[in-house]
Curated annotation (Swiss-Prot):
It is an enzyme of class 3 (hydrolase). The lineage of its organism: Bacteria, Pseudomonadati, Pseudomonadota, Gammaproteobacteria, Pseudomonadales. InterPro entries: Formyl_transferase-like_C_sf, MPG, MPG_sf. HAMAP family: 3MGH. SUPFAM superfamilies: FMT C-terminal domain-like. One of its GO terms (molecular function) is DNA binding. Disulfide bonds: none annotated. This is Putative 3-methyladenine DNA glycosylase. GO terms for biological process: base-excision repair.
Length: 231
């Protein structure tokens, strides 16, 4: 599962997904983004993480920001698929991509550090420096991006820089690097207040990485067919 021991052996440049990739239903996009790699260039380094957990949001359901109406701050949600929507959650930055249809989007909930010929050990080392724990110590690599704000901190993504922007493939992109997840878990989203459509199963997790996502949907007490579905 892990690729954290891969050594950098090439100067291949990453190839980002076209904007048209994001112009699809939010749930479809949320599933299809699993296994893709977010890459952010900082100086000479590409900081990279494999998407392992996403959440879909629709304008018409109460759990979404878009359901509160259009504002200048939320305008990216109402733009074409592939626009970046960033906001602050619990004091940290969060990353979303607009999907097909005004107000529909996907939240990148968590990821897993990705090391390959483009993003070598030096890139991982920089991500560890970017996102230490509360005592200033390096986090375990597996937990470095285990949450939406941890992900953005590790990758160095900031609301003022990227909100309402398109991808710039020289600096920030999402790349298809290989096989899609073998199994996907579908379950309810996290942090949705009571009465705000918290029952909707719009959260998707790469089953192979379930233990490293924001909250493991396969933890003790969870029942398949009631609490989650395996796709």
């Amino acid at each position: 599962m892990s690729n954290l021991t891969v050594r950098a052996t090439s100067t291949r440049q990453p190839v980002g997904l076209a904007d048209a990739f994001f112009d699809r239903d939010a749930q479809t996009l949320a599933r299809d983004l699993l296994g893709k790699v977010i890459r952010h260039r900082v100086g000479d380094l590409w900081l990279s993480a494999r998407i392992i957990e996403t959440e879909a949001y629709y304008c018409e359901e109460k759990g979404s920001h878009a359901s509160l109406g259009y504002t200048e701050k939320r305008k990216a949600l109402f733009l074409d698929g592939g626009h970046i929507y960033m906001y602050y959650a619990r004091g940290g930055d969060s990353l979303n991509f607009s999907a097909q249809g005004p107000g529909n989007a996907v939240l990148i909930k968590s990821a897993y550090p990705w090391v390959d010929e483009i993003s070598g050990p030096a890139s991982l080392a920089q991500m560890l420096l970017n996102n230490p724990d509360a005592q200033g110590r390096p986090r375990p690599s597996q937990k470095l991006c285990a949450g939406q704000t941890l992900l953005c901190k590790a990758l160095g993504l900031k609301v003022p820089v990227w909100d309402a922007k398109r991808f710039d493939h020289e600096i920030l992109l999402v790349e298809d690097t290989g096989p899609a997840p073998t199994h996907v878990i579908q379950t309810t989203r996290l942090g949705i207040p009571h009465g705000r459509d918290e029952h909707l199963m719009y959260r998707f997790v790469d089953a192979a990485y379930a233990q490293w996502c924001t909250r493991n949907p396969l933890r003790r007490g969870q029942v398949e067919g009631r609490d989650y579905f395996l796709l």
